[in-house]
């Protein structure tokens, strides 16, 4: 669950909110059930606006969003406005969202005698794992013959690809 930090200040009956502490939020492409919340003020209601699909929670201090299948940075993708029990609305608090789509290069069929090669992902800083993987490199002879599932993980997102290693013809 992701918390949007807000600060409440009363000034002549008006409510305003502080800044969000983590911005932008990073989610995986097609993420389902991402939760966002602000500190609950008894008696207040909350109006949420999002570029994702609001799955549940409108009117409360906590919502669930399903994100779509188009990667990119979405400014003000989550916005919440608190209205006090006396009907005074605060200023909206906005959160940018980066929808991450991991694209991997290196899939294909290789011979067991082929040299070690470097695996690539469109987003840097993640970790490759699987048979034959050493750091960011794939070694066909270390992996052995067969189909190998290689996984790349970054910021809670992961993507897989298949690499096939064949014996050399006799």
Residue ranges of model-derived segments:
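Bacterial Sec-dependent N-terminal signal peptides
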Residues: 1-21
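Proline- and Ser/Thr-rich low-complexity, intrinsically disordered segments
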Residues: 16-170
């Amino acid at each position: 669950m992701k918390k949007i930090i807000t600060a409440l200040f009363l000034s002549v009956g008006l409510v305003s909110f502080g800044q969000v502490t983590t911005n932008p939020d990073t989610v995986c492409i097609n993420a389902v059930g991402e939760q966002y919340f602000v500190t609950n003020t008894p008696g207040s209601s909350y109006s949420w606006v999002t570029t994702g699909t609001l799955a549940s929670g409108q009117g409360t201090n906590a919502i669930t969003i399903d994100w779509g299948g188009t990667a990119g940075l979405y400014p003000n993708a989550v916005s919440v406005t608190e209205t006090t029990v006396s009907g005074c609305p605060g200023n909206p608090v906005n959160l940018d969202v980066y929808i991450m789509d991991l694209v991997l290069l290196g899939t294909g069929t290789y011979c067991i005698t082929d040299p070690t090669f470097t695996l690539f992902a469109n987003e840097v800083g993640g970790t490759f794992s699987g048979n034959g993987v050493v750091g960011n490199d794939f070694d066909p002879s270390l992996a052995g013959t067969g189909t190998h599932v290689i996984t790349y993980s970054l910021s809670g997102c992961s993507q897989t690809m298949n690499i096939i290693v064949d014996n050399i013809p006799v």
